[in-house]
From Swiss-Prot:
It is found in: Secreted. The keyword Cell membrane does not apply. Residues 1-27 form the signal peptide. It comes from Papio hamadryas. GO terms for biological process: lipid transport; positive regulation of triglyceride storage; triglyceride homeostasis. GO terms for cellular component: high-density lipoprotein particle; very-low-density lipoprotein particle. Belongs to the apolipoprotein C4 family. InterPro entries: APOC4. This is Apolipoprotein C-IV. The gene is APOC4.
């Protein structure tokens, strides 16, 4: 059950990564729209035909998706999303991290002290 709980805690970070990758993809696709087509010699290669066919199939899907999500890419919507994400997940990250580090340090010191008599000092009963 704890494994599932850890995965659910990672979900917001995963959603943010997917969102950022989608933003990058949308920006890059707009940058490539004005690029010239390759020379005719390169158009005839097998991989160029495959790439052309894939572009032909995916371009309408990408355009429809971009049009549907255009409202989301506006600066005010995206800024609002990022602010909400920060407020919900990152605002108290510093204190949480500090508390976790202190707890981990204490745990490590306790484990080290419990091992000390056996490894360094030896058992007192063996005398």
């Amino acid at each position: 059950m704890s494994l599932l709980r850890n995965r659910l805690q990672d979900l917001p970070a995963l959603c943010l990564c997917v969102l950022v990758l989608a933003c990058i993809g949308a920006c890059q696709s707009e940058a490539y729209e004005g690029t010239p087509s390759p020379p005719p010699k390169l158009k005839m290669s097998h991989w160029s035909l495959v790439m052309g066919r894939m572009k032909e199939l995916l371009e309408p899907v990408l355009n429809r998706t971009r049009d549907r999500w255009q409202w989301f890419w506006s600066p005010s919507t995206f800024r609002g999303f990022m602010q909400t994400y920060y407020d919900d997940h990152l605002r108290d990250l510093g204190p949480r991290t500090k508390a976790w580090l202190l707890k981990s340090k204490e745990s490590l010191l306790n484990k080290t002290h419990s091992l000390c008599p056996r490894i360094v000092c030896g058992d007192k009963d063996q005398g």
